[in-house]
Structure formats: structure tokens, C-alpha cells
Swiss-Prot record:
Its main location: nucleus. Binds 1 Fe(2+) ion per subunit. This is Lysine-specific demethylase 5D. The JmjC domain is required for enzymatic activity. Residues 79-169 form the ARID domain.
């Protein structure tokens, strides 16, 4: 019975060796060393040193191979026997017209082979039925008892197996008259049997060579219709394994069998049978049963003609071939194979009725079943693979089979599954194996030295390594190096590309040689090995368990196609070991060691054979084994021995000894065989150079052995020859016609043997000389040169590494060591410094060693002389040590004398101790002397450490204690100083001064105390700097204070002034932050100082634009204070210089902007259709040329921009602040003023807010560049405001303002009259005569529209979207004022200067309205602004409600009297209208509003009015400081000047 997968028990592990680098250098020597251990297991594994990693040298892209196909369950011997049995019994029933259906018993298919075998072992069918032992049969088949399974097995046996067994025994052929029939039928297919599969695996495309694939193809006359309609037959349409790796598919009854047989129809011998029927019966019955199938002969043409011409007689001869009667013709049955007839009741067993379909007679069935099976072998796949494609296929197969990643499948699981699959007849798993790939053709995995490619140094190292499989077979110690031919697989490595389950079957190597396998990479390879001592036992077990296979193929184990479960072998006493070979490991198999295995997954291995000296006896035995099996040899063993014997000096000594032994045996055998030849009477002979003949021309025709020393040939039969062991099998010719062909005469062979003996015995001669020299047997010591000559002879003649050679080398090494020590003694002191001196004991041992060496050494006298000097020195030193007060000088002189001896004398140590004590005491006195320079703490600690190492004495102990006490005190003060330097809580200077003062009394240099001194000095210097800067003429600059704060924080001293400075710096930073929030936009690319100072590059358009783009991209470095004002760092500290520089910057800014306006005005308008890009064309901030609709022109620099790239004003932001706002048709009040981001760099807060910042600035005792720039900006704004108010107060301008006010009031009145219409929906029709009560239309305002329609539109605009406002654009006209040239030009200049200010002033807006009213409305700009405002208009309704609520709260605050806050809110409203731009998201506008509220709070929290700003005490500001009243005398009157009465807003 086959064992389950869980029953597999892994055999024990084989030996594993891990050589050192020294052992790894010589591979064959190491293998010889481990052979006694490893040979007992048959195989072993070797792990090279970790850093031995040869590169993979195969050209992966060009490597292509065709693998073999392996069907796993056809590999195992016992499984193959079962499959063969199923094939035969399936064919038996199919021949009779029945289909085999294997039954299921207890939910598993019935093992018919095991059932048949057990029944046979139990005595046969009749005996079992008689004794009623079917229950025992069921028990042996592992079926449970008590279920009446025995009766079921009996019925299956009777129905399926028993008829087949009867045919096999020939019981039904007792009285059958058989006739010759054609033995060469075309139908040699294995017939189907029904074996259910666990996995339905269709044969792959490469199996078209097999019969399994052929069965998938349609037959000439298919019967598929019956199979498809019959569910039972459909279930049996499955595939199993056969003896030639060919599955058998279940088929319906084959109606074409008769037709197929008719093609080679057998002609019954009708005439002969009629005349002598009984004689033919006797002839056939006299033949052996097993020869029945071979006794028939095919019909000849004459027989066919005879049958044709006597067709009438042939019909009359339809008689039963058993009873020879023709009656009861309705019971006669015609054979479809041979056309013989039988009564159905004459057959054994008799048939109840005429069977339907094809029927064959018993002799045809016997002939078909007795046909011998074809030899089993592997097929080649049809698909060619590369390494990559094969690896992808292999990994995919393994991952799909185990349903997990390939690297996660345990090796134990793969091993159990492999042995389950090969033992299963139910599952048919097919894999591919790239085996026996020639490295000569495809390239080796190891680097190989060749002229095709130059190797790197690393590759060259591995190319010459003995472990390179291309090098190992041809090493000097290897036998195969003496074979000239490149034997593939033996001398030339083979490559193996494996996948999971791909296997190599049980086998031994050719000629029983060694083999070595190296796994280059990939998943492990599992090996099983059997030692050579159990090789015959393994063969016997396999033959005993599967005799059916070995009967037809006696050399089955030599074909590498058969496996057997290691557990089965072990259960029969065969010792088996296993191992998993991982990447980078070697596996070695020993001579005649059977081995097999399989691959765990995708991998790449390389293998080759090699033969050492110990293999020669096994090689000779292998030739005898091959001779018995009549197997061909790979090479001639005799030729190999003779070739090595011809050049004995080139042989390794161990190899020479082994060859001599083999040569001696071979010569003795040759003498015996040639003597037998002479006794037979063969005397003719001729010399033949067998090595020049092809192997197939010198093979023995009997045993297939390759001849070399001699062979027997015949003059009359020149085509063949035999070896001398088969001289009787050559031919039948007379002995006189036979002659001997020989290679060497019997006299030449002993001469070759003698040369080998000399080479083999040369070691004995040399060994005798060495033994005499080492043991001084003749009483004479050899010189060192003589011993060296003996060692050189062993090395040159390659003697083995024996114990005697090792003794010789050890003796030479000892002599060399003694000579080296003697040279150290007698040489100068400089040479002795390199080595440690000898002790007195070692000197005496050296003298004794030199005397005992078997080598004569003349240096022994020098050693004796040194020993005498040492003994005399000992006496003198003892006398000096014994005196009471030895002088230091005497002891030092004796010490130097002892050092010159080169010997370590014990008295010298005592002298050394006393000298060291005196030297150490002297060093301590010098270090602690008052006049000496203070030593460092490290020096004192070093003295203490040195004192602990010297020998103890009263003086030394006292000095050591004093030094220890001093160090303890010093370390305590060092710790205090360290605590002061590192502690988080800093100490005041007075504390530090006290610590330093006390530490001055310690006579040691203390590093931490010195650091504390330095820190205190720095602190005092810092205090002086603070006093100096605080008492100067001006307030200190913020940069100076920050530097002082940074320095003060790093000092380990508590400084009271530091807290004051930190507070001042913090206050200054807070003021700067508030100013930045007030002026700078969100995410502005400008600094506060850049915004407050005049634009230095206002006149350069390209420079200005480039810098702006760089700042937007965060590539621009902000200008420093000195760059902005053009002043040095020293001038910045002078307020007067800052004011002058600011004034100059104003003038440059104005001149630059005028130049820029002229330049930009000359550029073509983007709105013109003919505008083309040129050097004079405007460039937007996005870097592109603005063109077409959606472009805006800056009112300051006159340059053009895309409306989507810049922030644009909201046209109705100031026109409709409330329901009582000015009407829509007052277009001159619309906020259409556009300043580009290059001109409007900040938020431009209102002047009142800035004044609050200035008040906070006066309270700071710190000077900031931004503060002085803000003062200059404020003065500039106030000066401009005064000029603007003066211009607005002139008579002409006042008149114009009155006209605008009148127009505005008129439009407001009209709007109030339309208020009843506000509640009317925009889509409702207007009442008739609704315009009767309306005031008269203002002339020139809407000339083409009547009042009714205009009022309707005005009312609808107030409650609708901007589309209504867009519809009014065509009705606008102007100008509404007549603005004279004399009035307009001054206003435009003021407008220009006001736009340059980064401050919001109401006068600026009034001047803008006057200039707008004095010119026609800019419809193109208005259209552009409306178009840009539309996308965000819907989303702004909700935001408008929230902002309106805030404005109402602000209005309530105004009503309570908070005028300053009201001004700020108005400023925010106007600024909101101008600077809202393209921000369409509600969050952005609300954030901006909150930031502006923060700016307002700065002003509100100050709680000051204008009068408080004017009442600054000049005495509180230092002389020439940057105060408001000191620097800006014009500030006071301008702040209190009232606004004009004509307030348009």
C-alpha cells in the first residue's frame, strides 16, 4: 500500500563540513581528509568560507535551453508498476469490447494492483473463497472492519481481475487451436483505465510526443457522441500515468478496431487446418506459454492468394477451433482479430450470449497482453526557454500550487508533497527540468579563462580556483587530468536549471566516480544518499519490490529514470541520509554512492565528476560490473592506468602508489588471460595502438568493454573483436584464423611497473634518510643545510604530507627559532628593542633546547657566553641592593648595564623600582614647589596615577597622601566652578568673585576656575558696554540692543541690566509687529521698511517688475537698511542723515514714476486689434503680454495688466455702502481707480491710525529704522494733505465741488421718489404713468433715456445683480463738469504724488472724483471691472450681509462719540472697495477684514487724540533725536486744519 504524505519521515542529515581558509585552499586534499567520515554516508555537504562568493558568469540573455518533461507519478518504481498493471488490465477489457471502470470503496478508488497482489499472496482466489478470508484481504488493504467490505472486494475481484488473471495463467488456452498471426500490429497504444484525479491537469502542449496527448486528438471514427451522452462514461474520461509517461484516456467501445486489424489481416491456414488440425494443436500446445506471443508468423503473399482463390472452401471451414464442429452456427462467435470461430459454450469461461461490438478470441487477447512494454525514458519539451522565462514559469507554478509566495513555502512541506505525488496514481503532475545542459555550449556558471573576454582580477581569482568545477577535474591530484578527451558531464561540467518537484532519480556516477555539485543561486535542492557499502542492498531491494520493471530492463538503475521512497528503502534496512543544499554550497557524492533528489524551486546548479587516487580500485571494480551488465564504458580504465604509468614522475606520490597497485593487478590479470589464449592455440599476434581507434571499433562484442591492453580478432570476421575474457564468443572460425591484438608486450608491462615502483618507493628512501637524521642513529648531527635539502626534496618531488615530513619541518622551525633568539642576544641593543628580552629561565631553556636538537648549531657557544655575563651581573646587583644608602647614579648605571645584556634579570626589576621611586618623588617636589609654575589638574592626576603604580615605601606613601589631599580640594573647587558655569540658575558677579578669590590659594591650575574668571571679565565688559550705550546722545538702536542681549544671555552670570534690555527689545519687536500688520498685506513679499521708504526703482519698469516676480516666487532677497536709504551703518544712527536720505528718495521716486509713465504711455494699447509683441509692449506680472478684453491700465505707472492676475477694485463697494447711498448713475463716484501691485505695495492705512503708532513709538527708548521711516512717511503725507486741502479750498475747485454736490442731491431725490417701487418685484410690470411724479431729468446725465425707464432700472439695480448695471453703461455720458486746464493740471500732479504715498487720505479720493467728473466715463474699464466682478458677485451676497452687520455695530459706536474709530471704519470701507481685487472666497475677505480690525484696535487702545500727539514734551526727547515735534515742525497745524465744508461723501 502506498503511504500518505503525512507518513513521510525525513531521513537523518548527512555530514556537513565548514572548512577554514587554510583547509579550503586545496580541494582534493580536503576531500581526502574528510573521506573517512563522509564516505560512510555516501554524500556530504560543504559550506565554503563566507567570503568565497564566485560571480555568476553565464550570459543570461543568450542562455537558451530546452528542458525535459517529468511526470512525477511515473518516476516512482512501485507507482509505475501499479500504472503498468492498470494499463494491462484496461487493455485486456478494452480488447474484449468492455470499458474498465475502477470502483470506489469507502470513498476511495480501489487499488486493483494491491488487491491482486494480496489475493495471490493469500493463496489465490479459490483458496480465499474456500477459507472465507476476504475480510482479511480487506484488512490488509486498510479498510475498516465490520462493514462487509470483504464481500464487496470479492465481487469486484470476480468481475474485473479474475478474468484477467485466468488469461494471464493461460487457463483458457488449453484446447485452443492457435495459428500464426501478424505480430506487428499498428495499434501499440496503451488502453484507457478510469483513475479519478484530485486535480484536473490537462497535459501541456509539449507532451505531443506522448500517447496521452494523442488520445486528446480525435480518432478517425470517433465515438465521442456516446461518451458525452453517457454520464458514467463522461466521469471516466480522465488521465493517468503509464510506463512511458503516457496517460490513458477512457474511450468508448472502438468500432474501428476491426478496420484497423483488417489492414494487416491474418490469414488462417485454412487448408492446413482442415488436413491436420490436431497436429497444429499439438504444435501450439507444445510451445511454452510465455512464447505464445512470439511463435506466430505473418501471412505471406502466397497465403493471401490461397485464401482468395479458395474463398468458397474458407466459408465452409467456419468451425469451432476448440471442438472442431460447425453445428449450432447461431452460437458460433467470430474473432475480430484473427477471424477464428468459437462456440460461446466452448470458451473458458463460457459466454451466456453473443457479445455486442468488438470481440477477440483468447489467443489474440493473450498475444496482445503478453507484448513487452517499451523502455521508459524522458521526453524533451518543445518550448525553448531563457532563464527569465523559465524562472517566471517555475515561480508561477509553485505559487499557484501552494497558494502562497514561493519564498514562504517551507522545505518540509515541499518534501512531503513531492513524495506524496510520486506515490499517487490519482494525481498526474507534470514539471520540467533543464538537466544535463553542456557548459561547453552554453557557458559555465563559473568564470573561465578564455581569449574571448578579459576577466577582472576578482574573476581571475575564481577562474583559477580549485573549487571551480571547470578546474577540479583536471587538477594534478585528479586522475581525469590524464584523459585527453573532454568527456561531457565528467571533465566538462553540466548545468541544471530546476523548478519545484523536478527530480533526479536514484543513480551512481559513471565509472563509480566522485561527483561535486555547486548551487549557484535559487531555492534549495534536496538530496538523498546511500553509502557504497549499501549499493548492492539498494539494488536488491528495488528489484525485489518491483521485479516487473527489472525483468524487462535489467540496467534500469543506470537510466536515471526510477525513484523509490527513502522510507521504503529504510524500512528494508538500506541506510539513507538527506540534506538541503542551499545557494553557495557544495554537495559531494562518493564512489558507488547512490543518490537522488529534487528541487525545492527555481534554481541553477552545476555539476562535474572527478577521480582521486583512492578511486582507482573502485574504478576497476566498476569495469567488472559493467562487463557483467554488458554496459558501454565512457573511457578505457586500462588505457588510463597505462597512460599514467608512462610518465610516473608527473604523478602525485599518492597517485603513483595507487597506480602502482592497480598496474600490478592489471599485469597479473593480463598474464593469466594471455596464457589462456596460448593454451587455446592462438599464437598469432600483432601490435595495435588502441588509443588511436574510435571507441566503437575496439569494444568487445560480448560485454561492450573498451579494449586497450589486448583483444582477440579474426581474420575472417574483421568487423568485431572480443576481450580476452570472452575469447569463446568471437566467432565459430578456427583458432588458427584468430589472432591477438595487443598494445604492450608482456616484457614492456613490467618495465612500466618498475618505473612506477621507483616513483612510489622514492618516498621510502627519502623517509629513511629523514628518520636517520632526526633520530641521530649514526651518532652524527646533521647541519641545518642538510635538513633543508631533505625538505626541499620532499617539496620538489611532491611527497605526501606525512608525519615524518611534519617532524622534519618542526625541527627546522625550532632550529630557526633558536638561531633567531641567539641573533637577538648577540646583536646590538637597537635590534633587541623590536623583541622582548629573554628571562634567565628562558635563556637556560634555550641552551638546553639547542643542545637537544638533532641539528648541529655553532651558535651554542654564544649562548653560553651570555649566560656567564648574566650570572656575574646578578652578583653585582645584589651587592648594590644590600647597601643601606645606594646612590641613584650607581643604580642607574647598573640598570643600563642590565639592559645591554638583553636578558631579563630579577635583580634588574628591583633596581628599576628604586630608580622609579626616586624619579617620582623628584617630580612631585618640582610640581608643588612655590616658585614653580602651577601645574594643571591633569598633570597632578597623572602624578597620582603614576605613584600608585610604583613600589611602596614610606617616602612614597607620604607624598602620595599629600598629593591626594591636594587633588581632592582642587576637584571640589573645580566642581563648584563647573556648577556655576553650567547651572540653570545664574549667580551674580559678587558670588563668582568670592569663589575665584578663594580658589587662588590652591597651587594647581584649575580650568573651570579660569573659565569662571573669563566669564566674569566678559560680564564686566558687557555691563560697561550697556552703560555706554544707555548714556549716549541718542537712544540705542534695536540692532545694538539685540546684540547685547544675545551676548548677555550666553554669559553664565546673572545680570540685572539684561532684563531691562530684553524688555526694551521685546517692546520694540511688538511695535514692529503691529506696524507690519497695519501696513503689510497678507503674505506680502515686501518688508515693512521697504513699504515705508520711497521706491528706489520706481523709474525702472523691467527691474521693478523682475524684483516683484522674484519676490512672489520667494527668490528675491529683501534689501537691507543701508541699501534702501543708501546710507552706511554709521549714518543710520544719525537721525538727520536719515531724514535727508528720505527726502532724496522722495524726489527720485517722483522722477522715476514720471519717466515710467512716459515710457508706458508710449506703449501700444492692448485693446487695439493690431497690437503685437515687441520690446516696447507691456508685460503683465505673469510674464505674458496683456491683450484683448479683461486688461486694465494702472492709473499710476500707466502699464497694462491682466485683470485676472491682479487685485481690482469693486465698482460698487463705495457707491452703495447703505440704502441711503448715492445713486448708481453717479458714475464719477464709482470706484474704478486701479493701482497695480507694483505701485500699491501695502494696505495703505489711514493717517489717524498711523498717528497712534507714532505715539507708541515715542514711548520706546529704542531706535528702529522702521520708526524713523514711518515718521518721514507721516510728515510726507501731512505735507501732501495740506497742499491737497489748499487746492480743494480754492474758489474754482469749490465751485466744481458744489456742482457735483448738486448733481448728487438731485439723483438722491429721484431715488427717494422711487422707494415705493423697491418692494415691487423686478419682473412685475410698471404702473402706467409711474413717471408723472418724478423730478425732471438732469441734463446731460442720461440723454437718451426717459425718466421712467431710468428710474425703473435704478430701482431694479438696487435690488438685483450687476447685469442691470451693465445695461446702463450705454446710457452713461459725460463729462458732467467743465474742468479747466489750469485747474486740472495741478490736481493731476497732486493725484500723482498722493498715489505714491503708502497712506490713505480722503483728499486723494476727492481729487479723483473731480478728475473723473471732468472727463468722459471710461466705459472700457467699467466693462472690464464688471466682467471681473461677475464670477464672485453671487458668493459676495452672503459675505456682504456679515460685513454689513459689522458696519452697523461700528455705526453704533460712532453714535456713542467714538469719532476716531469711525474714521478707521470709513477707511476700511474705502480700502475694502479699492483693494479687494479678485479674491472671490469668503474666507479671504473675512480674514482681511479681521486684520484691518486689528490695525484699528492699535489706534483705539492708544486712547489718544490729535492734541495728545501735538503736546509731546520736547524735553522728554533727547537732543537731535527722531521725535515727531523735533523732526516734523509742520505736523501740528496740518493735523488741526478742518476739512472743506463740501463733503461729497
Amino acid at each position: 500500500m502506498e503511504s500518505g504524505s503525512d507518513d513521510f519521515l525525513p531521513p537523518p542529515e548527512c555530514p556537513v563540513f565548514e572548512p577554514t581558509w587554510a583547509e579550503f585552499r586545496d580541494p582534493l586534499d580536503y576531500i581526502t581528509k574528510i573521506r573517512p567520515i563522509a564516505e560512510k554516508s555516501g554524500i556530504c555537504k560543504i559550506r565554503p568560507p563566507a567570503d568565497w562568493q564566485p560571480p555568476f558568469a553565464v550570459e543570461v540573455d543568450n542562455f537558451r535551453f530546452t528542458p525535459r518533461i517529468q511526470r512525477l507519478n511515473e518516476l516512482e518504481a512501485q507507482t509505475r508498476v501499479k500504472l503498468n498493471y492498470l494499463d494491462q488490465i484496461a487493455k485486456f477489457w478494452e480488447i474484449q469490447g468492455s470499458s474498465l471502470k475502477i470502483p470506489n470503496v469507502e470513498r476511495r478508488i480501489l487499488d486493483l494492483y494491491s488487491l491482486s497482489k494480496i489475493v495471490m499472496e493469500e493463496g489465490g482466489y479459490e483458496a480465499i473463497c474456500k477459507d472465507r478470508r476476504w475480510a482479511r484481504v480487506a484488512q490488509r488493504l486498510n479498510y475498516p472492519a465490520g462493514k462487509n467490505i470483504g464481500s464487496l472486494l470479492r465481487s469486484h475481484y470476480e468481475r474485473i481481475i479474475y478474468p484477467y488473471e485466468m488469461f494471464q495463467s493461460g487457463a483458457n488456452l488449453v484446447q485452443c487451436n492457435t495459428y500464426p498471426f501478424d505480430n506487428e500490429e499498428k495499434d501499440k497504444e496503451y488502453k484507457p483505465h478510469g483513475i479519478p484525479l484530485r486535480q484536473s491537469v490537462q497535459p501541456s502542449t509539449f507532451s505531443s510526443y506522448s500517447r496521452r496527448a494523442k488520445r486528446l486528438q480525435p480518432d478517425p471514427e470517433p465515438t465521442e457522441e456516446d461518451i458525452e451522452k453517457n454520464p458514467e462514461l463522461k466521469k471516466l474520461q480522465i488521465y493517468g500515468a503509464g510506463p512511458k509517461m503516457m496517460g490513458l484516456g477512457l474511450m468508448a467501445k472502438d468500432k474501428t478496431l476491426r478496420k484497423k486489424d483488417k489492414e494487416g489481416v491474418l490469414c488462417p491456414r485454412a487448408v492446413l487446418m482442415k488436413e491436420e488440425p490436431r497436429e497444429d494443436e499439438r504444435v501450439m500446445s507444445s510451445l511454452p506459454r510465455e512464447d505464445l506471443s512470439h511463435s506466430v508468423e505473418p501471412c505471406t503473399k502466397m497465403t493471401m492468394q490461397l485464401r482468395t482463390h479458395s474463398s468458397a472452401q474458407f466459408i465452409d471451414l467456419y468451425v469451432c477451433r476448440i471442438c472442431s464442429r460447425g453445428d449450432e452456427d447461431d452460437k458460433l462467435l467470430l474473432c475480430d482479430g484473427c477471424d477464428d470461430t468459437y462456440h460461446i459454450f466452448c470458451l473458458i469461461p463460457p459466454l451466456p450470449e453473443i457479445p455486442r461490438g468488438v470481440w477477440r478470441c483468447p489467443k489474440c487477447i493473450m498475444a496482445e497482453c503478453k507484448r513487452p512494454p517499451e523502455a521508459f525514458g524522458f521526453e524533451q519539451a518543445t518550448q525553448e526557454y531563457t532563464l527569465q522565462s523559465f524562472g517566471e514559469m517555475a515561480d508561477s507554478f509553485k505559487a499557484d500550487y501552494f497558494s502562497m509566495p514561493v519564498h514562504m513555502v517551507p522545505t518540509e512541506l515541499v518534501e512531503k508533497e513531492f513524495w506524496r505525488l510520486v506515490s499517487s496514481i490519482e494525481e498526474d503532475v507534470t514539471v520540467e527540468y533543464g538537466a544535463d545542459i553542456h557548459s561547453k555550449e552554453f557557458g559555465s556558471g563559473f568564470p573561465v579563462s578564455s581569449s574571448q573576454r578579459i576577466l577582472s582580477p576578482e574573476e581571475e581569482e575564481y577562474a583559477t580556483s580549485g573549487w571551480n568545477l571547470n578546474v577540479m577535474p583536471v587538477l594534478d591530484q585528479s586522475v581525469l587530468c590524464h584523459i585527453n578527451a573532454d568527456i561531457s558531464g565528467m571533465k566538462v561540467p553540466w548545468l541544471y536549471v530546476g523548478m519545484v518537484f523536478s527530480a533526479f532519480c536514484w543513480h551512481i556516477e559513471d565509472h563509480w566516480s566522485y561527483s561535486i555539485n555547486y548551487l549557484h543561486w535559487g531555492e534549495p535542492k534536496t538530496w538523498y544518499g546511500v553509502p557504497s557499502l549499501a549499493a548492492e542492498q539498494l539494488e536488491e531491494v528495488m528489484k525485489r519490490l518491483t521485479p516487473e520493471l527489472f525483468d524487462s530492463q535489467p540496467d534500469l538503475l543506470h537510466q536515471l529514470v526510477t525513484l523509490m521512497n527513502p522510507n521504503t528503502l529504510m524500512s528494508h534496512g538500506v541506510p539513507v541520509v538527506r540534506t538541503n543544499q542551499c545557494a553557495g554550497e557544495f554537495v559531494i557524492t562518493f564512489p558507488r554512492a547512490y543518490h537522488s533528489g529534487f528541487n525545492q524551486g527555481y534554481n541553477f546548479a552545476e555539476a562535474v565528476n572527478f577521480c582521486t587516487a583512492d578511486w582507482l580500485p573502485a574504478g576497476r571494480q566498476c569495469i567488472e560490473h559493467y562487463r557483467r551488465l554488458r554496459r558501454y564504458c565512457v573511457f578505457s580504465h586500462e588505457e588510463l592506468i597505462c597512460k599514467m604509468a608512462a610518465f610516473p614522475e608527473k604523478l602525485d606520490l599518492n597517485l603513483a602508489v595507487a597506480v602502482h597497485k592497480e598496474m600490478f593487478i592489471m599485469v597479473q590479470e593480463e598474464r593469466r588471460l594471455r596464457k589462456a589464449l596460448l593454451e587455446k592455440g592462438i599464437t598469432e599476434a600483432e601490435r595495435e595502438a588502441f588509443e588511436l581507434l574510435p571507441d566503437d571499433e575496439r569494444q568487445c562484442i560480448k560485454c561492450k568493454t573498451t579494449c586497450f591492453l589486448s583483444a582477440l580478432a579474426c581474420y575472417d570476421c574483421p568487423d568485431g573483436l572480443v576481450c580476452l575474457s570472452h575469447i569463446n564468443d568471437l566467432c565459430k572460425c578456427s583458432s588458427s584464423r584468430q589472432y591477438l591484438r595487443y598494445r604492450y608486450t608482456l616484457d614492456e608491462l613490467p618495465a612500466m611497473l618498475h618505473k612506477l615502483k621507483i616513483r612510489a618507493e622514492s618516498f621510502d628512501t627519502w623517509a629513511n634518510k629523514v628518520r636517520v637524521a632526526l633520530e641521530v642513529e649514526d651518532g652524527r648531527k646533521r647541519s641545518f643545510e642538510e635538513l633543508r635539502a631533505l625538505e626541499s626534496e620532499a617539496r620538489e618531488r611532491r611527497f605526501p604530507n606525512s608525519e615524518l615530513l611534519q617532524r622534519l619541518r618542526n625541527c627546522m622551525h625550532e632550529a630557526e627559532a633558536c638561531v633567531s633568539q641567539v641573533l637577538g642576544l648577540v646583536s646590538g641593543q637597537e635590534a633587541r628593542i623590536q623583541t622582548s628580552p629573554l628571562t634567565l629561565t628562558e635563556l637556560r631553556v634555550l641552551l638546553e633546547q639547542m643542545s637537544s636538537l638533532p641539528c648541529a648549531m655553532h651558535q651554542i657557544e654564544d649562548v653560553k657566553e651570555v649566560l656567564e655575563q648574566v650570572e656575574a651581573y646578578q652578583i653585582e646587583a645584589r651587592e648594590a641592593l644590600a647597601s643601606l644608602c645606594p646612590s641613584v647614579g650607581l643604580m642607574r648605571s647598573l640598570l643600563e648595564k642590565g639592559q645591554q645584556l638583553g636578558v631579563d634579570v630579577p635583580e634588574a626589576h628591583q633596581l628599576q623600582q628604586q630608580v622609579e621611586q626616586a624619579r617620582w618623588l623628584d617630580d612631585v617636589k618640582k610640581a608643588l614647589a612655590p616658585s614653580a609654575q602651577r601645574g594643571s589638574l591633569v598633570i597632578m592626576q597623572g602624578l597620582l596615577v603614576t605613584g600608585t603604580k610604583i613600589a611602596s615605601s614610606p617616602c612614597v606613601d607620604k607624598a602620595r597622601a599629600e598629593l591626594q589631599e591636594l587633588l581632592t580640594i582642587a576637584e571640589r573647587w573645580e566642581e563648584k566652578a563647573h556648577f556655576c558655569l553650567e547651572a540653570r540658575q545664574k549667580h551674580p558677579p559678587a558670588t563668582l568673585e568670592a569663589i575665584i578669590r578663594e580658589a587662588e590659594n590652591i597651587p594647581v591650575h584649575l580650568p573651570n576656575i579660569q573659565a569662571l574668571k573669563d566669564a566674569l571679565a566678559k560680564a564686566q565688559a558687557w555691563i560697561a558696554d550697556v552703560d555706554e550705550i544707555q548714556n549716549g546722545d541718542h537712544y540705542p538702536c534695536l540692532d545694538d540692543l539685540e546684540c547685547l542681549v544675545a551676548v548677555g544671555r550666553d554669559l553664565p552670570v546673572s545680570l540685572e541690566e539684561l532684563r531691562q534690555l530684553e524688555l526694551q527689545v521685546l517692546t520694540a519687536h511688538s511695535w514692529r509687529e503691529k506696524a507690519s500688520r497695519m501696513f503689510l498685506k497678507k503674505n506680502s513679499c515686501y518688508t515693512l521698511l521697504e513699504v515705508l521708504c520711497p521706491c528706489a526703482h520706481a523709474g525702472s519698469d523691467s527691474s521693478k517688475r523682475r524684483r516683484w516676480i522674484e519676490k512672489e516666487l520667494r527668490l528675491y532677497r529683501s534689501c537691507t537698511d543701508t541699501e534702501l536709504l543708501g546710507l552706511s551703518a554709521q549714518d543710520l544712527r544719525d537721525p538727520g542723515s536719515v531724514i535727508v536720505a528720505f527726502k532724496e528718495g522722495e524726489q527720485k521716486e517722483k522722477e522715476g514714476i514720471l519717466q515710467l509713465r512716459r515710457t508706458n504711455s508710449a506703449k501700444p494699447s492692448p485693446l487695439a486689434s493690431s497690437t503685437t509683441a515687441s520690446s516696447a509692449t507691456s508685460i503683465c506680472v505673469c510674464g505674458k503680454v496683456p491683450a484683448g478684453v479683461g486688461t486694465l491700465q494702472c492709473d499710476l505707472c500707466q502699464d497694462w495688466f491682466h485683470g485676472q492676475c491682479v487685485s481690482v477694485p469693486h465698482i460698487l463697494s463705495s457707491s452703495r455702502p447703505s440704502p441711503t447711498s448715492s445713486p448708481l448713475l453717479a458714475w464719477w463716484e464709482w470706484d474704478t481707480k486701479f493701482l497695480c501691485p507694483l505701485c500699491m505695495r501695502s494696505r495703505r492705512p489711514r493717517l489717524e491710525t498711523i498717528l497712534a503708532l507714532l505715539v507708541a513709538l515715542q514711548r520706546l527708548p529704542v531706535r528702529l529704522p522702521e520708526g524713523e521711516a514711518l515718521q518721514c512717511l507721516t510728515e510726507r503725507a501731512i505735507v501732501w494733505q495740506g497742499r491737497a486741502r489748499q487746492a480743494l479750498a480754492s474758489k474754482d475747485v469749490t465751485t466744481l465741488l458744489g456742482q457735483l454736490a448738486e448733481l448728487r442731491h438731485q439723483l438722491q431725490a429721484e431715488t427717494r421718489l422711487q422707494e415705493p417701487y423697491h418692494s415691487t418685484p423686478a419682473c412685475a410690470p410698471l404702473r402706467e404713468g409711474s413717471g408723472r411724479d418724478m423730478p425732471k431729468q438732469v441734463p446731460g446725465l442720461l440723454p437718451n433715456v426717459d425718466s421712467t425707464s431710468s428710474h425703473e432700472k435704478i430701482a431694479s439695480v438696487q435690488g438685483s445683480d450687476l447685469e442691470v448695471l451693465s445695461s446702463l453703461l450705454s446710457q452713461l455720458s459725460g463729462p458732467v463738469l467743465d474742468l479747466p486746464e489750469a485747474t486740472r493740471v495741478p490736481l493731476e500732479e497732486l493725484m500723482l504724488e498722493g498715489d505714491l504715498l503708502e497712506v490713505t487720505l480722503d483728499e486723494n479720493h476727492r481729487i479723483w472724483q473731480l478728475l473723473q467728473a471732468g472727463q468722459p466715463p471710461d466705459l472700457e474699464r467699467i466693462c472690464t471691472l464688471l466682467e471681473l466682478e461677475k464670477p464672485e458677485h453671487k458668493g459676495s451676497r452672503t459675505r456682504g450681509r456679515a460685513l454689513e452687520k459689522r458696519r452697523r455695530r461700528q455705526q453704533q459706536e460712532v453714535d456713542l462719540g467714538m469719532k476716531s474709530k469711525n474714521l478707521v471704519q470709513e477707511e476700511l470701507q474705502s480700502k475694502k472697495a479699492r483693494n479687494s481685487g479678485n479674491k472671490s472666497e469668503e474666507g479671504q475677505e473675512e480674514e482681511e477684514f479681521e486684520e484691518e480690525r486689528d490695525s484699528e484696535n492699535i489706534f483705539l487702545t492708544c486712547s489718544v487724540d490729535h492734541s495728545s500727539v501735538l503736546k509731546v514734551n520736547p524735553n522728554s526727547v533727547r537732543q537731535n533725536d527722531s521725535g515727531i515735534t523735533a523732526s516734523f515742525p509742520s505736523l501740528t497745524p496740518l493735523l488741526h486744519q478742518p476739512y472743506p465744508q463740501q463733503d461729497i461723501l
